[in-house]
């Protein structure tokens, strides 16, 4: 087998859809026993700030949990395509049918609320974390 250059690998990855990339990442995690999740820093609270409220979260993850009404699947697929530009019909259908799936990560509270409202109105169940 001929060795691929980094440039060839990057080019091949660039041609894949979002859904295909997600599957590739899962396969790599399983094969190499690693996770693609970013490390989480643990911050110890100071003694003087014992009563201080936790900082308000600024980035959210929007997850499609499923369908509230299976008869509205087509509407949810259309909204998923609006949320994820460039997502093909087949990939959007697979994403909806494979729920729960992450729709968007690291979005603002306002954007997360807009996505939830649109998907919920179309017949989907959404979780913001």
Curated annotation (Swiss-Prot):
Question: At the top level of its lineage, which domain of life is listed?
Answer: Bacteria
Q: CDD domains, alphabetically?
A: Ribosomal_L7_L12
Gene3D superfamilies named among the record's database cross-references: 3.30.1390.10, Single helix bin
Instruction: Keyword check for NAD, yes or no.
Output: no
**Keyword match Ribosomal protein:** yes
A Pfam family it matches: Ribosomal_L12
Provide the alphabetized UniProt keywords. Ribonucleoprotein, Ribosomal protein
Q: Which GO terms describe its molecular function?
A: mRNA binding; structural constituent of ribosome
GO annotation, cellular component aspect:
cytosolic large ribosomal subunit
Quick one: a GO biological-process term for this protein? translation
Indicate the quaternary assembly.
Homodimer. Part of the ribosomal stalk of the 50S ribosomal subunit. Forms a multimeric L10(L12)X complex, where L10 forms an elongated spine to which 2 to 4 L12 dimers bind in a sequential fashion. Binds GTP-bound translation factors.
PANTHER family attached here?
39S RIBOSOMAL PROTEIN L12, LARGE RIBOSOMAL SUBUNIT PROTEIN BL12M
What's the family? Belongs to the bacterial ribosomal protein bL12 family.
Task: Write down the NCBIfam families for this protein, in alphabetical order.
Answer: L12
What this chain does, per the entry, is described as: Forms part of the ribosomal stalk which helps the ribosome interact with GTP-bound translation factors. Is thus essential for accurate translation.
Q: What is this protein called?
A: Large ribosomal subunit protein bL12
Report the gene name: rplL
């Amino acid at each position: 087998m001929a060795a691929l250059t980094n440039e060839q690998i990057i080019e091949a990855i660039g041609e894949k859809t979002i859904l295909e990339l997600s599957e590739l990442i899962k396969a790599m995690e399983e094969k190499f026993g690693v996770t693609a999740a970013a490390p989480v820093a643990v911050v110890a609270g100071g003694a003087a700030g014992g009563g201080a409220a936790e900082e308000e979260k600024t980035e959210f993850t929007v997850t499609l949990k499923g369908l509230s009404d299976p008869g509205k699947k087509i509407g949810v697929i259309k909204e998923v395509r609006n949320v994820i530009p460039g997502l093909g019909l087949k990939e959007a259908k697979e994403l909806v049918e494979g729920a729960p799936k992450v729709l968007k990560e690291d979005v603002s509270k306002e954007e997360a609320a807009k996505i939830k409202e649109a998907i919920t109105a179309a017949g989907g169940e959404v979780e913001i974390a």
